[in-house]
């Protein structure tokens, strides 16, 4: 089975931007186990800007574009270093792919992305994809968020399953206005699977506002 997994900044890092080592190790352990079972895994990972904030010891997440780009450049190195180190412990090789809106909109580039992903999976590597926040700054070059990027990647590589991981406490059964929505707490595993197609809109401390489909890796 070919699986695309997306993980966000709020899952990987603390509000300070520092890496949540326990969460990162648990994620890598689960994904490595999936690969050991014979599944093809692609990881779409946020976290570059947040980790850049921590690495540069900034007091807060910057608001200006240039500093955000600088944080993304620094944080992406830290992010990939962490993934490479953790996956190496399970004898898995990772590969970095950074994309922009231009890459996914342009037909020839999209085909190149598909070919690269296919070959990496054939070689047994685990592709790790992120939006190239160091250069993607406007409506033309920016994809918007990594939930959208994960969906694009899943379609591009003809994935069998798309999993969007989140640390939210519950799900809404409908869109806004919220007074018309029923708040559903996450229950037992069976309930989670049954509700996997429902969507939630929630804003986290480092993430953008996004739509999430909850599912499980097991």
Language-model-detected regions and their locations in the chain:
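Nucleotide/pyrophosphate-binding catalytic subdomain
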Residues: 1-217
């Amino acid at each position: 089975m070919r699986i695309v997994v997306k993980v966000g900044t709020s899952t990987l890092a603390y509000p300070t931007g520092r890496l949540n080592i326990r969460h990162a190790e648990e994620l890598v352990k689960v994904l490595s186990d999936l690969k050991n079972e014979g599944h093809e895994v692609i990881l779409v990972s946020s976290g570059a800007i947040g980790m850049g904030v921590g690495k540069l010891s900034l007091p807060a997440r910057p608001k200006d574009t240039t500093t955000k780009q600088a944080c993304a450049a620094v944080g992406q190195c830290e992010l990939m270093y962490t993934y490479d180190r953790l996956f190496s412990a399970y004898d898995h090789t990772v590969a970095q792919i950074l994309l922009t809106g231009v890459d996914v909109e342009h037909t020839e580039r999209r085909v190149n992305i598909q070919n690269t992903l296919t070959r990496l999976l054939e070689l047994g590597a685990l592709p790790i994809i992120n939006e190239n926040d160091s250069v993607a700054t406007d409506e033309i070059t920016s994809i918007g968020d990594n939930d959208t990027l994960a969906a694009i990647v899943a379609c591009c590589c003809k994935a069998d399953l798309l999993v969007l991981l989140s640390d939210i406490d519950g799900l809404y059964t409908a869109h806004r206005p919220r007074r018309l929505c029923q708040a559903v707490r996450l229950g037992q595993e069976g309930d989670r699977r049954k509700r996997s197609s429902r969507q939630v809109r929630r804003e986290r401390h480092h993430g953008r506002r996004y739509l999430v489909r909850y599912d499980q890796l097991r």
